[in-house]
């Protein structure tokens, strides 16, 4: 559910927020009302363009929320508490010939982007790919890179599944790393966490039944089979 783009004759921006009575979208500082449709959906003809930042305001029947990031954000340039940004999906890939590596042939190196290089970024990892290739490594596994609170973190309390940590270089930095790794015959494997959200920066419960009453040491449990999970 969450957010979806709809293209009919004109593009529209839709968000699923059954917990809200009303909703607005803020695009580069300007508020626009969203129209309620069926099943907890709200829609708006104002659509942010790539590079524009946006956030949502939700009315719970009593008061308006503070600006909230997109629950399905692709990029959080100011961190998990800030506005979301529309990401352009085009990229000048050079790895068209890449065909992957059989599991039985993999020589795997697990690394943490934030500490693997002095820069603590995807570009910093690129600078050490030749070193890894010389070791005989042909696959790297990245500890989780989904957005988390702060600048450095193990990654296991991320809150935005579809985005990439801004301090590591964001989605463009990850694309550059994957492309550079493939050019050296190195596969890239992502370590991901899908059973919980981190304790800071998770606003999804304000939109709808995305979490349950359960809790882990890392944060709220994702609502996979509880009330509202089949909405």
Where are these regions (language model features)?
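Short proline/glycine-enriched turn/loop motifs at strand-loop junctions of beta-rich domains
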Residues: 16-22, 49
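Residue-level detector of conserved, well-ordered beta-strand and adjacent loop positions
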Residues: 16, 35, 87, 143, ...
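Short beta-strand elements bearing conserved aromatic residues within extracellular beta-rich modules
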Residues: 23-25, 54
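The feature marks proteins involved in alpha-glucan
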Residues: 1-12, 33-110, 115-120, 131
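Substrate-binding/active-site clefts of carbohydrate-active enzymes
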Residues: 77, 96-103, 112-231
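Active-site-proximal helices and loops of the catalytic beta/alpha 8
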Residues: 28, 41, 182
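Predominantly extracellular/luminal cell-surface or secreted proteins
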Residues: 26-28, 59
């Amino acid at each position: 559910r969450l957010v979806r783009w709809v293209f009919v004759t004109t593009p529209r921006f839709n968000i699923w927020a059954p917990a809200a009575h009303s909703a607005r979208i803020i695009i580069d500082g300007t508020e626009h009302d969203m129209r309620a449709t069926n099943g907890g959906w709200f829609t708006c003809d104002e659509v942010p363009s790539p590079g524009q930042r946006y956030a949502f305001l939700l009315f719970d029947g009593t008061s308006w929320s503070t600006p909230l990031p997109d629950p399905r954000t692709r990029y959080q340039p100011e961190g998990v508490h800030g506005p979301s940004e529309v990401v352009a999906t085009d990229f000048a890939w050079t790895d068209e010939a890449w065909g992957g590596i059989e599991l039985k042939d993999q020589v795997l190196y697990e690394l943490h982007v934030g500490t693997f290089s002095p820069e603590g970024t995807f570009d910093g990892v690129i600078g050490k790919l030749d070193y890894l290739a010389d070791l005989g490594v042909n696959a790297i596994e990245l500890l989780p890179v989904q957005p988390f609170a702060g600048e450095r973190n193990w990654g296991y309390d991320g809150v935005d599944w579809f985005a990439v940590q801004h301090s590591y270089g964001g989605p463009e930095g990850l694309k550059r790393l994957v492309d550079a790794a493939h050019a050296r015959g190195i596969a890239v494997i992502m370590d991901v966490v899908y059973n919980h959200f981190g304790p800071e920066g998770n606003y999804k419960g304000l939109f709808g039944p995305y979490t349950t009453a359960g809790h882990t040491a890392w944060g709220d449990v994702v609502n996979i089979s509880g009330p509202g999970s089949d909405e």
